[in-house]
């Protein structure tokens, strides 16, 4: 640090601290800490606290002594809440979105080659420890942890248990005294495509919450309904959400409508009303924001029939 500012090392640096080495170590990439600063966290808009989840997750993040898992459907604000808390409290955020192809190298790191030879590019786990030590307090946010294969999940065991460390590229990464790293993960319900159960040993490391889908009353709080007709648009839309959820419970459809879908609906409805669009605004909004989500032909026809009946429209 110089004059309170981060002085970046060269793009590649030599590992020192030989006592922490656990294997061969050489050049590694440097970390641009400003990327993870709370000042650079995206503003995802105001978060609506429905069930006291803001206070609970804030407490978990401030204590940073237990990994926390949020289990819930897509589009209900899991990511938004983590961003909101970190921005508000000046906490650095290291966010990582898991996918079907995420592997050990994404978590721990991988060897790369440049004109000077090989070097180790650190993955998200060692990066999180470095950011926490630099900023004194950071959150490692692992989005969609259930997308990880079981053999990849095991590499999270060590950072999430009482060892609070990881080994990568021949070096041990751990927290300095007085530094905190809160770990928050999210996952969608197991019935979603591409979602795996967490292994027992990984589950045993988490505490957490299971978030339910918002009720119609809560959806009225989340969505900005100003200038949206109640009888012809708002009420039928809320009814449709409940109907499609019932269809999902019977396994007739895979996709359920989330708050994100409703927000898209009212935004598109407004946009079309303010544009030069000459067709039926309600029917077009339904097609663009609801029916487009159902790619299976049988599900598409079923949901279209429900939309026609609920909204009193005639979408062909």
Please provide the spans of the model-predicted regions:
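C-terminal regulatory/interaction module of P-loop NTP-utilizing enzymes
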Residues: 1-316
């Amino acid at each position: 640090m110089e004059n309170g500012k981060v002085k970046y090392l060269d793009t590649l640096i030599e590992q020192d601290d030989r006592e922490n080495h656990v294997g061969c170590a050489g050049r590694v990439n440097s970390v641009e800490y400003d990327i993870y600063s709370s000042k650079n966290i995206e503003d995802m808009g105001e978060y609506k606290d429905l069930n006291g989840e803001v206070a609970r997750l804030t407490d978990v993040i401030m204590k940073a002594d237990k990994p926390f898992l949020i289990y819930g459907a897509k589009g209900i604000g899991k990511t938004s809440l983590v961003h909101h808390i970190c921005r508000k409290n000046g906490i650095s955020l290291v966010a990582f979105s898991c996918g079907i192809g995420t592997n050990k190298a994404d978590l721990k790191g991988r060897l790369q080659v440049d004109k000077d030879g090989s070097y180790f590019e650190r993955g998200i786990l060692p990066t999180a420890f470095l950011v926490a030590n630099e900023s004194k307090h950071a959150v490692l946010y692992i989005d969609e942890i259930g997308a990880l294969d079981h053999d990849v999940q095991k590499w999270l065991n060590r950072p999430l248990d009482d060892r609070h460390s990881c080994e990568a590229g021949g070096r041990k990464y751990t927290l300095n005294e007085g530094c905190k790293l809160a770990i928050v993960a999210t996952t969608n319900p197991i019935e979603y495509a591409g979602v795996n159960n967490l292994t027992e040993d990984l589950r045993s490391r988490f505490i957490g919450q299971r978030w339910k889908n918002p009720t119609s009353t809560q959806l009225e709080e989340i969505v900005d309904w100003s200038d949206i007709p109640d009888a012809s648009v708002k009420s039928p839309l809320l009814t449709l959400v409940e109907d499609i959820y019932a269809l999902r419970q019977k396994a007739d459809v895979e996709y359920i409508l989330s708050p994100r879908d409703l927000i898209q609906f009212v935004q598109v409805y407004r946009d079309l009303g303010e544009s030069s669009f000459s067709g039926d605004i309600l029917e077009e909004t339904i097609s663009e924001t609801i029916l487009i989500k159902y790619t299976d032909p049988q599900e598409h026809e079923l949901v279209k029939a429900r939309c026609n009946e609920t909204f009193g429209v005639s979408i062909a």
